């Protein structure tokens, strides 16, 4: 199982949770995605993110390439409307180990 964690900072005064609610079903229906959770930092409430679960790294790669229309549309929506572009966006990809 592969987990992708993406975090970013919201623009002050923007209702990012509303964007998450309106985009959740579209994101969850993307081929290859097993599970999706949205998160907000308890330490810095302007920091939001998404935790995406994929079965394999190939599913994640397909999400970014073959599903690029949906993926790019959602990324563009976040960047243009909700995200503070002066602060960093972080992406981390993890593999769950069978230990």
What are these regions (language model features)?
Residues 28-34, 53-90:
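An amphipathic, aromatic/His-enriched active-site/gating alpha helix that lines ligand/cofactor pockets
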Residues 11-13, 43, 55-59:
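Short coil/turn motifs at secondary-structure junctions
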Residues 18-22, 66:
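Long, highly charged amphipathic alpha-helices
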Residues 21-29:
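Short amphipathic alpha-helix segments
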């Amino acid at each position: 199982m592969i987990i992708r964690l993406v975090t970013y900072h919201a623009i002050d005064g923007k209702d990012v949770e509303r964007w998450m609610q309106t985009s959740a079903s579209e994101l969850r229906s993307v081929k290859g995605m097993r599970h999706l959770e949205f998160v907000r930092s308890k330490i810095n409430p302007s920091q939001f993110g998404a935790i995406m679960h994929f079965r394999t790294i190939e599913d994640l790669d397909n999400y970014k390439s073959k599903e690029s229309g949906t993926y790019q549309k959602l990324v563009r929506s976040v960047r243009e409307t909700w995200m503070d572009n002066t602060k960093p966006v972080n992406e981390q990809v993890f593999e769950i180990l069978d230990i």
